[in-house]
Amino acid sequence: SIELSLLLSVPASLGLIIASEEIINALFGYGSFSKENVSMTSEALTWFGYGIPAFSLIKVLSNFFFARNNTTTPFYISLFVVTLNVIISLSFFKEVGFIIIPISTSISTWVGVLIYTYLLNRYSFLILQKSIIKNIFKIISSAVLMSFVLLHGLEYFEESLNFVNKFKAIYLLFIVSFVATIYLITCYLLGILKIKNYKIN
């Protein structure tokens, strides 16, 4: 479950970090939604992108406690994460502005992941085998390769993704589809994705 979580969340995270402006521009860059609105919204999306793996992992890691009928620990961790989020947001809102909200959300969630990881290792609830660590490295490597392809794709279609282009969403969809295909092929070649594991009986 950890591998599957990272398999989906790591490329999604890098994709949002790299192409946040193009995504917001393609989806909402029309009419009264100005370039300034696109810039501000994409900045927030970028910071949320940093937290995507944590958002995914924290749900997976909490299940190790739920499976043992331990609901108290996840509750207190969630309470701490929310409290930390609020404290960071209120402490820096005047200096940083609205952008502190996605920043604090990502930071606090990653702290929650670290707490879960520490406790799971302490109680020996989670033992990462070498094969899992190896696959995690492969996932990250595949996602990094995907990021390079995405960067070159955005650069190549820069004019087509311009704010004033009415068909920018189509070009972005093409880029995303191509990049996702490259990522899946890379994962398959590295042995992360195995078709036999996804056959429907």
Model-derived features with residue positions:
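Membrane-embedded alpha-helical bundles of multi-pass transporters/translocases
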Residues: 1-201
